[in-house]
Amino acid sequence: MKNHKGLSLGLLSFAVLAFGLLVPGRPFAQDQIQRAKIFQDTYELISDTDLYCSFYMHEEGKPLPDLRIIGADRMNEKEGFIEQDVIYLSKGQADGIEIGQIFQIIGLEDKVPPYGTVTQRRGRARVIRLEKKVAVAKIERSCWAARVGDYLLPFEEGQGEIGKDKGYDVMDPNASKTGQVVYVDQDYRTTGSGRWASINMGRQQCVQIGDQVTVFHRARPNLPREAVGSMIVIDVRGATSTVKILACRDAIEAGDEVQLNTTR
């Protein structure tokens, strides 16, 4: 009997609480409901990790930076350098390097003919000491281990994006520009949600950061294409772009077709 009475009181309390949350004129409750609805529709499409830890295609014929890592404090102990490690740069005070300057560390990876070389953003380093021809820097953020011979570029702040995944569906092949996936993250044959890939569409095709792309797969060249995923552009070069896979129902691989999503 006591258990039955306790259960009844518990149900009554729950009903009162639910009524209090839904009753008109309670802005806090309505605000929470509205917030929940918003978060179902929008989220962080481009994150700091996408901006500073992804890769891009260094295109054939483009010059490489002339600032490089020439050594490290612990280079006799290990080959890869991460956060808090001290590295030595190929230029110094006489070359205009200043204390406090921040550089992005990049490293060359796989060649992807005819587009260029996959270039990985390894992290960033800050100059802490100067000599005439050498700068001393400390790695502040590490995405991937930096190595002797890696290049450095002046660090530039990127801008993330909050928005809604437009999804993927059947599209008219003539509705917008099309291309192909030419490289998938870390040289896997296939890749999935949250990973990065390169496509052969860039500034030459008027592609911009934040554009969303639908990816299609064909079981055979003579069969209809099927939409398998959605992607967002996170970096744009002349003839290529880096994209992040937002969602997919099947593995995405090099050679899959892509098309700009014009859905509003």
Description of each model-found segment:
Residues G25-R264:
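Surface-exposed, polar/charged interaction patches used for macromolecular assembly or partner binding
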Residues L17-P27:
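C-terminal segment of classical bacterial N-terminal signal peptides
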Residues K2-F14:
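Bacterial N-terminal signal peptides that target proteins for export
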Residues M1-K2, A29:
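Intrinsically disordered, low-complexity peptide-like regions
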